[in-house]
Amino acid sequence: MVLKTELCRFSGQKIYPGKGIRFIRSDSQVFLFANSKCKRYFHNRLKPAKLCWTAMYRKQHKKDIHAEAAKKRRRTTKKPYSRSIVGATLEVIQKKRAEKPEVRDAAREAALREIKERIKKTKDEKKAKKAEVTKSQKSQGGKGAVQKGSKGPKLGGGGGKR
């Protein structure tokens, strides 16, 4: 049979079922205290870190060394090794890393210029297409100039204040 033990919010002691004092604050936060001493100290706003019998004090002042030693585990370190990235071999990457910054900057500038030209070209094509469409609409006699009838009054509950 397993007993569900809880911890005292002040002292850090184990509280077994049927024991302890439960305090529910006005903001619905639940506190469970081991005994009236813990409850009294909590309501008097004493800090558990300053009382030498609480778990918080013992932890801060490194009194439970045997419990802390069990937690320390060696972290496995990964050995670094070089591997190629998909789409580029290790030689290509090393070659790019070795080239001078001026060459790299020039290549970047050329690529940016090419991208800007492509964007400008697509914009010009869109403008030309739009101009053609507007020209054809005007020549058809103002097909798009038909006025719509005004909408009637809105019906239904708006749900506003009354």
From Swiss-Prot:
GO terms for cellular component: cytosolic large ribosomal subunit. It is found in: Cytoplasm. Keywords: Cytoplasm, Ribonucleoprotein, Ribosomal protein. SUPFAM superfamilies: Glucocorticoid receptor-like (DNA-binding domain). The keyword Membrane does not apply. Residues 117-135 have a biased composition (Basic and acidic residues). GO terms for biological process: cytoplasmic translation. It comes from the Eukaryota. Residues 71-81 have a biased composition (Basic residues). This is Large ribosomal subunit protein eL24. Residues 64-83, 117-162 are annotated as: Disordered. GO terms for molecular function: mRNA binding; structural constituent of ribosome.
